[in-house]
């Protein structure tokens, strides 16, 4: 929690105003931030200075794992995070590759589970990683990559958190996640949860111990219409003790995650927080 608040304060104090062409808004911006989450000791990085809807973050991650490309499928899991980008993004609405309402195109999980090969067919990056780790293999390239410039025109949004690199030291699994762009007030609490949970889930289904998850942000920013509530409300609140995160121990394989797992298979214990803050979302 401290590292999150320190980053927010750093942006407020030292950030540079940058015009964002996509949203038409100014962003107070810093370059490079490194966060760490001790998954092995269940130090769950859930924000307490405002209410954080962790279930929606986990639901979105599960949708990526399943390779979903439709906002309706994400809603069924329990998150509306893709409603706006799939249906309110003017450039995407006019894109000939859009298949209709709720279609997201070839983004995130589609790339992770069905990266198109130039000679035809697809690569299931995630399955390869799970198979390797289950067999104790780390080829120094256990990388789940969502960033495919050759297909940016076929999706509603470029990936923000685009790379997840898993590493084994003995029987302990580590994760390095890289994020090119981060809406800190609105998105970072989601992203922190997802990095933590991704390592916890992958360790569980591959039979490994969870170690530390390392989360790198390149462009970390606060939009101009988010600055006042961050500076004048959230940063003036005292953080509370952190909760613990739990996963149903019956989840034992990638197939389990693909088929029967629901949000009821994840729960948080001891979460206390301040009141919610409604930050504006920029499409």
From Swiss-Prot:
Complex and partners: Homodimer.
Binding site for dUMP: 22, 180-183, 191, 221-223
Keyword Cytoplasm annotated: yes
Catalytic reaction(s) noted: dUMP + (6R)-5,10-methylene-5,6,7,8-tetrahydrofolate = 7,8-dihydrofolate + dTMP
Name of the protein: Thymidylate synthase
Active-site residues from the entry: 160
Catalytic class of the enzyme: transferase
Record's function text: Catalyzes the reductive methylation of 2'-deoxyuridine-5'-monophosphate (dUMP) to 2'-deoxythymidine-5'-monophosphate (dTMP) while utilizing 5,10-methylenetetrahydrofolate (mTHF) as the methyl donor and reductant in the reaction, yielding dihydrofolate (DHF) as a by-product. This enzymatic reaction provides an intracellular de novo source of dTMP, an essential precursor for DNA biosynthesis.
Compartments, record wording: Cytoplasm
Classification via InterPro entries: Thymidate_synth/dCMP_Mease (IPR045097), Thymidate_synth/dCMP_Mease_dom (IPR023451), Thymidate_synth/dCMP_Mease_sf (IPR036926), Thymidylate_synthase (IPR000398), Thymidylate_synthase_AS (IPR020940)
Binding residues annotated for (6R)-5,10-methylene-5,6,7,8-tetrahydrofolate, in chain numbering: 183, 282
UniProt-recorded Gene Ontology molecular function terms: thymidylate synthase activity
Cellular-component GO terms for this entry: cytosol
Keywords associated with the record: Cytoplasm, Methyltransferase, Nucleotide biosynthesis, Transferase
Pathway: Pyrimidine metabolism; dTTP biosynthesis
Entries under CDD domains matching the protein: TS_Pyrimidine_HMase
Any GO BP: methylation
Primary location class: cytoplasm
EC number(s) recorded for this UniProt protein: 2.1.1.45
Family listed: Belongs to the thymidylate synthase family. Bacterial-type ThyA subfamily.
PANTHER family assigned: THYMIDYLATE SYNTHASE, THYMIDYLATE SYNTHASE 1
